[in-house]
């Protein structure tokens, strides 16, 4: 089977997303996961900062994986959450955004300052590639997107306001 046929006809939109292929971010399965993450993040951001047990419960449900001693200061924002993996002894300061359409892997002893943005998603620069073929109902996919993972190594400090683009490895 031709790779292009396999990607277009066999892979789910989530599989395409994680493989860095063009995918439809308006896919119903992806939207369901996205809405679930938004609800969990809202709950986390509204939980009293002293209620560490509830914050831990939410993070365990939201994130793809995490080590010991993770501290995330609210507010913070994600797309899916389940594509984010933290090592041990990590701290994320307030107002950070993780667009985890692909994997974001953060190593041990990482510090992330306020207002950091980590992006794994990007759009094709050719407008014709951003909008796919019409769906069976005649509508167009919302927008075709691609992704690349972001890897942050052990003992890395990301300074305030940094923007980390798709496909970047630090440390």
What residue spans do the PLM features occupy?
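Terminal amphipathic alpha-helical/low-complexity segments used for targeting or macromolecular assembly
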Residues: 1-69, 124-128
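Flexible, glycine/small-residue-enriched loop-and-beta-strand segment within the central core
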Residues: 76-86, 91-169
